[in-house]
């Protein structure tokens, strides 16, 4: 039927053409055709819905030729028949059908093929350009659904700023695509018959908008080569996408045998990098020139250049940085500096003086760290030049191709030195004088044996005078006169002088009969003069010995320093003598009952005492009293008073030895502090070595109790020398469990006489890792408190940590009560004895004491702690080798019982850069992670419930202003040359 219809159409068209031909040939006037008309489509609708599997039939009517076009998801299908027939429609037949006639006029109808199993037509992948709109091609096959929109994958929300417009025929258009949408996963979504249907997953890939030119750089901006050497340079091109072009270009279009290699990759989504490598395997002189790396994108272009210079052979060019003729005064320093260019690299450099090569005092280094650097600097440091050290100083440098040198003439301004003065056989007196500038020589005569002549001898009598230059740069002058004309006894003076100074020599003559002989100068000295010189020399020696012995005496100085101001590494300390003292701290002397001496030093001592009514009116309390010895001087008395003021300024803290009172009137100054019965931590650790339990166990149950009772060895505070408190015999003691041992002290170590004796027992408990962690934690807390008060300790070590009931540690400063003269830990340096092995490098070499240097000392303390009281840097004496190893970064290995985390803290405390060391507050936080919850809880309870004694409290909310300030008087331990 379709074929018959087509034949009928063909006959109609043929008949029409014949009729037109007849009309054209006749004499009838022609009739112009009407306006073109649109073809008509049946069914005459803009949209048509067809169910899947049904027949799709569309017809197009037009007087002329027509063509059907079907478009869906960007694909086109054509048909030149009047009808478009699809016997079984599918979802994929959804789309726009257009009929076009020969005049180009057309009509369209959009067909939906409803398919319950396929609601969306999906076209993948999904691309978008930043700043533009992009279409998610997911047109519907059923226009009657609702809530047609976008959804994020897996229930994730879409970006808040994402907006879109939905079109069932085309899909969903995302407006103004942003770079942040890259790799956004989404679905097209619609509600169909009460349920939500999702399309396949779309992943949006965003192409970044190019808003800047590429970033271009090269590995080196200049290169110098000899002929035959290989040359390569890398160009780095960075852009947001790979749509960038790049190339190497030689300027001025010069020919070259260069080759290029290219590599590129993406670093993330919008970070594209390309490397263009320029290679010349064997450079020639005509390869010299400027090479440009050029890159461009749609925004613009960028370029960078590198210069290649190829020489036929190597070279060395020396540039003195000063005049080669130098004048310097005797005793002054001078630096001879040259810069030089060398290619290939210099192989040998040296400074030479008087045929002697310097092995030190000079340094040679490149002008820059650039790989293509060819400029170097050499410096010779001449210190405290003497008159005989002038002369020629030569710098020599060589490489594989050439040698070169430069010479400096150094003249040292020195006063004249009379080298020889003698009577010649020809009747002449001669003076040979050396100095710079050139000395002048005058001759004088006077009768008798004098030491100074004033009558000049006329220049006409000077027979000879000439000069020459010595190798050391001095000018040597020879001057002679004829002494035959002298008729009387007398003295001839040869006097040489220049603008630096003068010198003289004497000739003495006496006549014996008719002969004349010279009297040598030594005959002029009388026994009286000799005796005077000997006596004066002995007096000088005695004064020097007494001065030396006085300087060797240890000078007492308060170690704790309160910082007033910090300017970089310059710390301004508050002068402790200017700190206020509140007389409410005063305590009656007659209420103190003194006991045994706990410790003594060169100037002072600490004595155990009982204070009556210090805390309560009817209570006795054991305290420690620091006082001066009768041999102490005014300096020590002022220092003890300063220590008292510093303690009162700081206030109370659980982990420092707190001030309880003082006696400053009516007698010698007494400083009353807390009493710590177990002595210093260093000796405590050494006593507990044999009972140390290596494993860290929890503080509960029978295991902990059994562990504490394993060690039955009796030990008391009197077992070791120089420690606190002999426990009284005849008292029954109770060994507490580990859970009890930190509760055994009344708060803050304020122990009263009426406390049960069971609380006053010596610490017989074993020592374990949890104890060591607790000690390190408490000391860090105490140091953090001192730092918060702007206080620097300067002598933090286990020997300066005291231990009291409950194993509470307290930081102290023994000061004048420590015998540092006989303590091997303190090394004599300058006018002080210093704990060198505990000191930070900046304190050793530059005399800089800061909060950071205290942190270094804390790291050494940790090493002592976890080695159970071993001396740091074992087996290593404090000598030049020790200083050198500290400078070179030598650090101790982890002690035997230190956990890895604690050794990490030690290493950070020992960082060569003070600013990279942790603060004490940070150290406290680090150690809190290591200690058990029970230990932390016990410590917190003690700290929270610890009462302050009823003594005055200084308000620290406002910094105390010092009338004067004093820096440390300690000298630097080691100058650079000593290492």
Swiss-Prot record:
Q: A Gene Ontology MF term for this entry?
A: growth factor binding
Which residues of this protein are annotated with the site description Important for interaction with phosphotyrosine-binding proteins?
Answer: 939
Q: Does the keyword Endoplasmic reticulum apply?
A: no
Q: Which Pfam families match?
A: ig, PK_Tyr_Ser-Thr
Which positions, given as ranges, span the membrane?
528-548
Q: Which segments constitute the Protein kinase domain?
A: 592-940
**Subcellular location(s) per record:** Cell membrane
Q: Where is this site: Interaction with SH2B2/APS?
A: 571, 939
Q: Could you tell me the membrane topology recorded for this protein? A: Single-pass type I membrane protein
Q: Which residues lie on this side of the membrane: Cytoplasmic?
A: 549-979
Extract the coiled-coil ranges from the record.
none
Q: Where does ATP bind?
A: 599-606, 626, 674-680, 799
Family per record? Belongs to the protein kinase superfamily. Tyr protein kinase family. CSF-1/PDGF receptor subfamily.
The protein's role, per its UniProt record: Tyrosine-protein kinase that acts as a cell-surface receptor for the cytokine KITLG/SCF and plays an essential role in the regulation of cell survival and proliferation, hematopoiesis, stem cell maintenance, gametogenesis, mast cell development, migration and function, and in melanogenesis. In response to KITLG/SCF binding, KIT can activate several signaling pathways. Phosphorylates PIK3R1, PLCG1, SH2B2/APS and CBL. Activates the AKT1 signaling pathway by phosphorylation of PIK3R1, the regulatory subunit of phosphatidylinositol 3-kinase.
Protein name as catalogued: Mast/stem cell growth factor receptor Kit
Query: Which species does this protein come from?
Result: Canis lupus familiaris (Dog)
């Amino acid at each position: 039927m379709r074929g018959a219809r087509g034949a009928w159409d063909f006959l109609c068209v043929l008949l029409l053409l014949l009729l037109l031909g007849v009309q054209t040939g006749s004499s009838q006037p022609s009739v112009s055709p009407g306006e073109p008309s649109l073809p008509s489509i049946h069914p005459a609708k803009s949209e048509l819905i067809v169910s899947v599997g049904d027949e799709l039939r569309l017809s197009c009517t037009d007087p002329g030729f027509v063509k059907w076009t079907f478009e869906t998801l960007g694909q086109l299908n054509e048909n030149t028949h009047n009808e478009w027939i699809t016997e079984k429609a599918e979802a994929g037949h959804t789309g726009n059908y257009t009929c076009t006639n020969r005049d180009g006029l057309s009509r369209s109808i959009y067909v939906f093929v409803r398919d319950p199993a396929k609601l969306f037509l999906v076209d993948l992948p999904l691309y978008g350009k930043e700043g533009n709109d992009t279409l998610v091609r997911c047109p519907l096959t059923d226009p009657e659904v609702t809530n047609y929109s976008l959804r994020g994958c897996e229930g994730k929300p879409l970006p808040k700023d994402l907006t879109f417009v939905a079109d069932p025929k085309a899909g969903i258009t995302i407006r103004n695509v942003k770079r942040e949408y890259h790799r956004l996963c989404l679905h097209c979504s619609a509600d169909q018959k009460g349920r939500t249907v999702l399309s396949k997953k779309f992943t949006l890939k965003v192409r970044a908008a190019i808003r800047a030119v590429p970033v271009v750089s090269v590995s080196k901006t200049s290169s110098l080569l000899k002929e035959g050497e290989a040359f390569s340079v890398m160009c780095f091109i960075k852009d947001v996408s790979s749509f960038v072009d790049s190339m190497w270009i030689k300027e001025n279009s010069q020919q070259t045998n260069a080759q290029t290699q290219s590599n590129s990759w993406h670093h993330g989504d919008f970070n594209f990098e390309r490397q263009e490598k320029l290679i010349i395997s064997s450079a020639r002189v005509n390869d010299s020139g400027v090479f440009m790396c050029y890159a461009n994108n749609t925004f613009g272009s960028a370029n960078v250049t590198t210069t290649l210079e190829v020489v036929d052979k190597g070279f060395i060019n020396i540039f003195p940085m000063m005049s080669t003729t130098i004048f310097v005064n005797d005793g002054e320093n001078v630096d001879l500096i040259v810069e030089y260019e060398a290619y290939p690299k210099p192989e040998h450099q040296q400074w030479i003086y008087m045929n002697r090569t310097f092995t030190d005092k000079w340094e040679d280094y490149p002008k820059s760290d650039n790989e293509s650097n060819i400029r170097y600097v050499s410096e010779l440091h001449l210190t405290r030049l003497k008159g005989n050290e002038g002369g020629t100083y030569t710098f020599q440098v060589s490489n594989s191709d050439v040698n070169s040198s430069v010479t400096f003439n150094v003249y040292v301004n020195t006063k004249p030195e009379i080298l020889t003065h003698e009577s010649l056989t020809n009747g002449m007196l001669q003076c040979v004088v050396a100095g710079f500038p050139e000395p002048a020589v005058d001759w004088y005569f006077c009768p008798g044996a004098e030491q100074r002549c004033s009558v000049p001898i006329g220049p006409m009598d000077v027979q000879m005078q000439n000069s020459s230059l010595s190798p050391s740069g001095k000018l040597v002058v020879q001057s002679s006169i004829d002494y035959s004309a002298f008729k009387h006894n007398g003295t001839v003076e040869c006097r040489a002088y220049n603008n630096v100074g003068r010198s003289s020599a004497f000739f003495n003559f006496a006549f014996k009969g008719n002969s004349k002989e010279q009297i040598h100068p030594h005959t002029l000295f009388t026994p009286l003069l000799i005796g005077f010189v000997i006596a004066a020399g002995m007096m000088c020696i005695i004064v020097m010995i007494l001065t030396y012995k006085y300087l060797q005496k240890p000078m007492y100085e308060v170690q704790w320093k309160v910082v007033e101001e910090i300017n970089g590494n310059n710390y301004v300390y508050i002068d402790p003598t200017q700190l206020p003292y509140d007389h409410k701290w005063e305590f009656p002397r007659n209420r103190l009952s003194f006991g045994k001496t706990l410790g003594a030093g060169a100037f002072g001592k600490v004595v155990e005492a009982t204070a009556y009514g210090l805390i309560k009116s009817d209570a006795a309390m054991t305290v420690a009293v620091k006082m001066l010895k009768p041999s102490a001087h005014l300096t020590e008395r002022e220092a003890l008073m300063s220590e008292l003021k510093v303690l009162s300024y700081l206030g109370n803290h659980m982990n420092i030895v707190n001030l309880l009172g003082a006696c400053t009137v009516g007698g010698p100054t007494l400083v009353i502090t807390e009493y710590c019965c177990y002595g210093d931590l260093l000796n405590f650790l050494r006593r507990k070595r044999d009972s140390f339990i290596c494993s860290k166990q929890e503080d509960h149950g029978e295991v902990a109790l059994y562990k504490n009772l394993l060690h039955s060895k009796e030990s008391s505070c009197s077992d070791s020398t120089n420690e606190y408190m002999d426990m009284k015999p005849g008292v029954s003691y109770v060994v507490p469990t580990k859970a009890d041992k930190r509760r055994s002290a009344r708060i803050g170590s304020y122990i009263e006489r009426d406390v049960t004796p069971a609380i006053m027992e010596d610490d017989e408990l074993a020592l374990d890792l949890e104890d060591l962690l607790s000690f390190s934690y408490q000391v860090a807390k105490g140091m953090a408190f001192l730092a918060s008060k702007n206080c620097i300790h300067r002598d933090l070590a286990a020997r300066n940590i005291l231990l009291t009931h409950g194993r509470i540690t307290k930081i102290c400063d023994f000061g004048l009560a420590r015998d540092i003269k006989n303590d091997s830990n303190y090394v004599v340096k300058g006018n002080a004895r210093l704990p060198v092995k505990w000191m930070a490098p900046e304190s050793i070499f530059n005399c800089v004491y800061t909060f950071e240097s205290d942190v270094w000392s804390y790291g050494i303390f940790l090493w002592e702690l976890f080695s159970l009281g071993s001396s740091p840097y074992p087996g290593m004496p404090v000598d030049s080798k020790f200083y050198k190893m500290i400078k070179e970064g030598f650090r101790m290995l982890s002690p035997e019982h230190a956990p890895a985390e604690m050794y990490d803290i030690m290493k950070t405390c020992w960082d060569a850069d003070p600013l990279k060391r942790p603060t004490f507050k940070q150290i406290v936080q680090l150690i809190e992670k290591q200690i058990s919850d029970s230990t932390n809880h016990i410590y917190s309870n003690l700290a929270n419930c610890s009462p302050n004694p009823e003594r005055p409290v200084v308000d620290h909310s406002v910094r105390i202003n010092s009338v004067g300030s004093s820096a440390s008087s300690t000298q630097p331990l080691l100058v650079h040359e000593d290492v």
